[in-house]
């Protein structure tokens, strides 16, 4: 704990704010508006993430949203890592909170999967590979994107802990809990058998 706080509270707070400022950029909304598609919040789930952008029929735009939402998790963490591990973790938390609760949109943001991935890429690429393997395996077998993301996110802190990254594991325990909370509607649909499957239209 002492090591994590070594940079001092002003630096930790600055890293948190930096992360939040990056995470709060609503790329899904910005890209769809620039593409002349209107407000993405008015279609599908009303979410600003890549999955809902895909419902516009623009795969390239959805891919760009996914990439940008991931990078806004990766870049502030990498920048803050120059100050130490504590600031890097603070920036990761800030980026994730910014994506979920952007001040510009009345604190109504995305569900966090892409930004979760982006933060994980910066802090533990090896664990990201495990995340991807779990997601792809379940997505291929069960055809549920949400279930795959939920399972992979739940496994992430356990994998990090097993690898000896206690502080990072603690951060991702918090991020995974928030991700599950934001996916509450998906969890209810999964339980009811009404969740949409990958590749299914309508």
Curated annotation (Swiss-Prot):
Q: Tell me, what is an example of a GO biological process annotation in this record? A: phospholipid biosynthetic process
Record InterPro entries: G3P_acylTferase_PlsY (IPR003811)
* UniProt superkingdom: Bacteria
Presence of the UniProt keyword Transmembrane in the record:
yes
Q: Which GO terms describe its cellular component?
A: plasma membrane
Question: Membrane topology per the record?
Answer: Multi-pass membrane protein
Chain ranges passing through the membrane = 11-31, 87-107, 116-136, 158-178
Identify the metabolic or biological route this protein is part of. Lipid metabolism; phospholipid metabolism
Where is it located? Cell inner membrane
Record-listed E.C. numbers: 2.3.1.275
For this chain, the family text in UniProt reads: Belongs to the PlsY family.
| Its biological purpose | Catalyzes the transfer of an acyl group from acyl-phosphate (acyl-PO(4)) to glycerol-3-phosphate (G3P) to form lysophosphatidic acid (LPA). This enzyme utilizes acyl-phosphate as fatty acyl donor, but not acyl-CoA or acyl-ACP.
Q: Name the chain's protein.
A: Glycerol-3-phosphate acyltransferase
Question: Which organism is the protein's source?
Answer: Methylorubrum extorquens (strain PA1) (Methylobacterium extorquens)
């Amino acid at each position: 704990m002492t090591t994590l706080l070594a940079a001092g509270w002003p630096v930790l707070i600055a890293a948190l704010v930096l992360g939040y400022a990056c995470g709060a950029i609503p790329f899904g909304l910005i890209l769809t508006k620039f593409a002349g598609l209107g407000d993405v919040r008015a279609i599908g789930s009303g979410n600003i993430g890549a999955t809902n952008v895909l419902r516009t029929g623009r795969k390239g735009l959805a891919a760009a949203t996914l990439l940008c939402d991931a990078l806004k998790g990766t870049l502030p963490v990498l920048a803050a890592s120059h100050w130490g591990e504590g600031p890097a973790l603070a920036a990761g938390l800030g980026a994730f909170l910014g994506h979920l609760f952007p001040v510009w949109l009345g604190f109504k943001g995305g569900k966090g999967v892409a930004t979760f991935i982006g933060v994980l890429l910066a802090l533990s690429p090896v664990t990201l590979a495990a995340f991807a393997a779990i997601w792809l395996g379940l997505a291929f077998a069960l055809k549920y994107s949400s279930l795959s993301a939920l399972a992979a996110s739940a496994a992430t802190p356990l994998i990090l802990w097993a690898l000896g990254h206690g502080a990072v594991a603690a951060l991702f325990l918090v991020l995974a809990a928030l991700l599950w909370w934001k996916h509450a509607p998906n969890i209810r649909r999964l339980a009811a058998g009404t969740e949409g499957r990958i590749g299914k239209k309508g």
